[in-house]
UniProtKB/Swiss-Prot annotation:
It comes from Homo sapiens. GO terms for molecular function: DNA binding; zinc ion binding. The keyword Ribonucleoprotein does not apply. Keywords: Metal-binding, Zinc, Zinc-finger. The gene is ZFAND3. This is AN1-type zinc finger protein 3. Residues 66-77 have a biased composition (Low complexity). Zn(2+) 3 binds at C174, C176, H190, C192. The keyword Ion transport does not apply. A zinc finger (AN1-type) spans 151-200. Pfam families: zf-A20 (PF01754), zf-AN1 (PF01428). Zn(2+) 1 binds at C18, C20, C32, C35.
Length: 227
């Protein structure tokens, strides 16, 4: 009986307090339920952190070893016979010094003008301008007229110097200004310089009858003229 009373007289022990201020328990490491749950969440992260770092280092080392193996496999050793020769490159690629004079000569040949002689120029001008020919002929005829000497006596033929009578002088006078006998009075016989054909054409044109066309121009009513 005395022991029971002594136990009852003892005060019950209080549970420990959590750092947050709530009551904890010995099962939860003297922490409340919330703090204990947070502690459990943090614990696996702390445990997995070194493991993940170790796994990453292992993977990196494996990748480096695999890369080294691949490079050792893919890089073949070239024999001296397979290596490219420098002479082949020099043959295929033309140098600028060789191409330079070729282009210069081509430009020079294009730029240099062709020289023409004076004879060819005069021939081309004569062929291109046919209108100038009659003028040249007229100039030559005038020079021939001036070169001919004047007839001293009109009683003799200018060609054969035979004596002419008065009737023969009148019949043998030519438009070129000279007097000829009956044998040389025609223009074809004494190389006449006068243009008889041109003069005949001009005279024919002057003698042509010009018609005055009055049909359709005057408008008169019937009976106006009679009145």
């Amino acid at each position: 009986m005395g022991d029971a009373g002594s136990e009852r007289s003892k005060a019950p022990s209080l549970p420990p307090r959590c750092p947050c201020g709530f009551w904890g328990s010995s099962k939860t490491m003297n922490l409340c339920s919330k703090c204990f749950a947070d502690f459990q969440k943090k614990q696996p992260d702390d445990d997995s952190a070194p493991s993940t770092s170790n796994s990453q280092s292992d993977l990196f080392s494996e990748e480096t070893t695999s890369d080294n193996n691949n490079t050792s496999i893919t890089t073949p050793t070239l024999s001296p016979s397979q290596q490219p020769l420098p002479t082949e490159l020099n043959v295929t690629s033309p140098s600028k010094e060789e191409c330079g004079p070729c282009t210069d000569t081509a430009h020079v040949s294009l730029i240099t003008p062709t020289k023409r002689s004076c004879g060819t120029d005069s021939q081309s001008e004569n062929e291109a301008s046919p209108v100038k020919r009659p003028r040249l002929l007229e100039n030559t005829e005038r020079s021939e007229e001036t070169s001919r000497s004047k007839q001293k006596s009109r009683r003799r033929c200018f060609q054969c110097q035979t004596k002419l009578e008065l009737v023969q002088q009148e019949l043998g006078s030519c438009r070129c200004g000279y007097v000829f006998c009956m044998l040389h009075r025609l223009p074809e016989q004494h190389d006449c310089t006068f243009d008889h054909m041109g003069r005949g054409r001009e005279e024919a044109i002057m003698k042509m009858v010009k018609l005055d066309r009055k049909v359709g121009r005057s408008c008169q009513r019937i009976g106006e003229g009679c009145s």
